[in-house]
Amino acid sequence: MGNAPSQDPERSSPPMLSADDAEYPREYRTLGGGGGGGSGGRRFSNVGLVHTSERRHTVIAAQSLEALSGLQKADADRKRDAFMDHLKSKYPQHALALRGQQDRMREQPNYWSFKTRSSRHTQGAQPGLADQAAKLSYASAESLETMSEAELPLGFSRMNRFRQSLPLSRSASQTKLRSPGVLFLQFGEETRRVHITHEVSSLDTLHALIAHMFPQKLTMGMLKSPNTAILIKDEARNVFYELEDVRDIQDRSIIKIYRKEPLYAAFPGSHLTNGDLRREMVYASRESSPTRRLNNLSPAPHLASGSPPPGLPSGLPSGLQSGSPSRSRLSYAGGRPPSYAGSPVHHAAERLGGAPAAQGVSPSPSAILERRDVKPDEDLASKAGGMVLVKGEGLYADPYGLLHEGRLSLAAAAGDPFAYPGAGGLYKRGSVRSLSTYSAAALQSDLEDSLYKAAGGGGPLYGDGYGFRLPPSSPQKLADVAAPPGGPPPPHSPYSGPPSRGSPVRQSFRKDSGSSSVFAESPGGKTRSAGSASTAGAPPSELFPGPGERSLVGFGPPVPAKDTETRERMEAMEKQIASLTGLVQSALLRGSEPETPSEKIEGSNGAATPSAPCGSGGRSSGATPVSGPPPPSASSTPAGQPTAVSRLQMQLHLRGLQNSASDLRGQLQQLRKLQLQNQESVRALLKRTEAELSMRVSEAARRQEDPLQRQRTLVEEERLRYLNDEELITQQLNDLEKSVEKIQRDVSHNHRLVPGPELEEKALVLKQLGETLTELKAHFPGLQSKMRVVLRVEVEAVKFLKEEPQRLDGLLKRCRGVTDTLAQIRRQVDEGVWPPPNNLLSQSPKKVTAETDFNKSVDFEMPPPSPPLNLHELSGPAEGASLTPKGGNPTKGLDTPGKRSVDKAVSVEAAERDWEEKRAALTQYSAKDINRLLEETQAELLKAIPDLDCASKAHPGPAPTPDHKPPKAPHGQKAAPRTEPSGRRGSDELTVPRYRTEKPSKSPPPPPPRRSFPSSHGLTTTRTGEVVVTSKKDSAFIKKAESEELEVQKPQVKLRRAVSEVARPASTPPIMASAIKDEDDEDRIIAELESGGGSVPPMKVVTPGASRLKAAQGQAGSPDKSKHGKQRAEYMRIQAQQQATKPSKEMSGSNETSSPVSEKPSASRTSIPVLTSFGARNSSISF
């Protein structure tokens, strides 16, 4: 039932599969010679719906692959050459054959390329699997990456643009060697490499991808059934676990599809040919050792004929004759070089016809050592079946595999698989490592003919433990499988438990990677005699005897052959290969492992002799050391340690299981913690959201429950109804008017008589409209009152915004007035100077004026952009003119009337300057000194203040000074002097004392002043009233001109009256524009809402330039300059006497009066601009 004949035409067919071909089941191609019944058949699976080509690699891809695996190739070449040289030196008679084999291996650009497949039909039964094994022996460490996809009909080529994996989309990354998304899908013995360029977003996508990659075997329904598990490999811990979250899938993830089905479910028998070993290493793991294939030489098709390949003597180990890459195992030893499929064991196949068949399964010698570090859960069967190596003489058992992982190597024997004894010993538990995860698919493809036919001797085909643990995570778990009855306990079976549980053959079946893996443990302690060895049909002594069968050979005692010659040849080959293995291991892997298995193997060699029959005695004694623990002592005591071996192995196995369980527990706890954290975070989020929602809902409800809001809503609804009614009435009235006009035109032009009913109808409509309109008008007052109630809040707000700054200003001015009065009284008390009665008379107008100014909200307003006037501009030049005449008007200062008030201001300034000097040194004094200084300074200030009022004696009259006089700072508060836009410090500051002294002297009301613009706008007004455009460079000149004007013309304008007469300037400073506009809007709103209510008088904005001009113009016509000059001279004389008593005041005063710099403010003088009433008023408080 071989399929090789069907492959020959397929091989000669065009290389690409058509879409129609894809609908047929995959072809299962054999590497080991297509002819001869396909006896070397290796299963190849073509991917359905995928076009595959014989040569998919482009030259660039091949070169890139070689470049990527350059390092591994170099190492592999070195090891292979060393091994071949060793073989040639050991077997000089076969040097030519070895050299040819070596050359063939070198010729292959990539040792994975299955070029020989194209010539399989010409090789017949002769080429031998040795050649192919040699070609396939290079298991690159990047095997899944760098294998030549030229020959593989599996559709895994990166360059295969015809591959149509469902979730894929082609991108530029496809051309890169290491595509960003590579998935390895394992099902049974097949591995598919898939390039994923998009994230697998759901399990359905993954199911579709898997079903597409395995179309003949898996469907979406099967994948979603509970009998199917999808496992993903944890590379860090080298275990497979069930895939629950597709986000775990990453680049280079290995996904295994596990079908919990009967043994044959997935693989019909027609796919198997003569039970040959079809498990070539098609996909070795990426980490696999480059040399693991060197010795994987398994029987070629000549095994079917029972004769060695023609070119090689039968004495040569079959590993040299026939290389079966089929049995190699793919180990996923996360990151480590996995061991080889099995030791280089070459057993003579036993056939009924007696013709010896060199059946050997020879893994890389280095694999024996490599396997020791493979972790429990390396599931390899999905990629390639391990060899079933029956535990023969025990010389070649894999000690590390036995101890560390329960891997079975399968070597299918020719013959009926089910003719094996009824004991049910499917596989002797030989090299436990060789079948790491040997799936049912693997077993069936290899052993259908030799394992699964009905056994003549009876006995359970599957042991009691079949399916006992469906998804075992590691082969170690196989030891727990219950054994079928019918045999003595296996005293040293690698995984056998206590003898009471033992059985002649314990079978453990792993359901894994798509179907069940069969693990049969063969108790090495099974008693077999030489006689039973010679009996062909003895069930206990033969594993798979039967007519025309080959015995299963592998690690462990050789199966008793029916032919003594076959047995002897097997033993001889076993010994030779054992010694070879030891030498090669020591040569290639010297120091790589703590102990070399060569000791064990040679020790086991001593346990059996070439002439020893394949009896149970030799078998039990030989099998013990090989399955013993790794230490060499195990091999040195071949017969004495079956129990110790079993216990030690069980301990190691149990320890591994405990570690795995503890790891799983830790992961489970982590998952629980994560879940709890997620729950907490979700709870917190829900609480936050709930609180936020409840707050918003309560806020909305509160807004609706707010009586004002409810009333506003009701009033708005009523207003809308009113407007609708009004609109309706208007419309009806329009219609009525039109109809009446039409009737009138008809009557006037056409002299048509209008019928009475029509007129009555119009009259009725008009009457109804009148009534409705009357009702509407009657309804309006109620609506108006309601709206006023609702809008009262807005009206109050507007009023508040309008009046509050003025109210604050008024309160502030009253405070200033009280302060001035108190200071004056105190000074009078201190100095004993009492004001004359006429001065007292001037106080009452002050208070009256202050109140009237406050009530009328009239202030001297200075916008922020223009700095306040400086005392030096008003007073300084006058002083300088009187003392040190300057410029072209040396006598103008004598004409000014306010000499005494100027001198009083000078004394105030002297006191202030003295205070600033002391304040600058405040930090140097203690608290006592500070208090003393404060008292002195306050006394000096209070002494200077009454002099200001002396002007009132000489100039009685209305004095609206409190409006404009900033409060004195008794504690010496100061602020930075204001700076002009041109950069000059406030050279035009208007200090309070100067204003106070000048105002009383402004008797006649001035004419309406011209509007002027602040100098910051580049506009100013000259003495004659002309508007001059100036730049910043001219600002100094303008200020000088203004100061000269003020020298000549001392302002006599009554500010209150002047301000009230001045219309609002058309061009207000920029900062004032918005405020004035807002005030206009507020005035309009209030005027509309308050029917008949008086609106607040608008603000008047007067720029400092305008006030200066007004003062100058008003002063021009002053008639009593001479009187003022006399008063000033008298006051100056008195003041000089007062200052003589105070040296500090005298010094500062002389500096102020005589220094020509007195026109500019001192650096320490400061003025605080007071911004009130929306920034409209800007008075300056100077110290």
From Swiss-Prot:
Quaternary structure annotation from Swiss-Prot or TrEMBL: Interacts with the N-terminal coiled-coil region of SNAP25. Interacts with BCAR1/p130Cas and SRC through its C-terminal domain. Interacts with CSK, CTTN, SORBS3/vinexin, SYP and MAPRE3/EB3.
Source species: Homo sapiens (Human)
Protein name: SRC kinase signaling inhibitor 1
Residue list for modification Phosphotyrosine: 241, 396
Listed Gene3D superfamilies: Actin interacting protein 3, C-terminal domain
Family: Belongs to the SRCIN1 family.
GO terms (BP aspect): exocytosis; negative regulation of protein tyrosine kinase activity; positive regulation of protein tyrosine kinase activity; postsynaptic actin cytoskeleton organization; regulation of cell migration; regulation of dendritic spine morphogenesis; substrate adhesion-dependent cell spreading
Modified residues (Phosphoserine): 13, 18, 45, 53, 64, 143, 165, 169, 179, 225, 298, 307, 324, 343, 362, 364, 493, 496, 500, 503, 513, 515, 517, 522, 598, 621, 844, 857, 866, 987, 1043, 1060
Residues forming coiled coils: 654-674, 726-746
Sequence segments annotated as region (Disordered): 1-44, 284-379, 466-643, 861-907, 949-1032, 1058-1081, 1105-1183
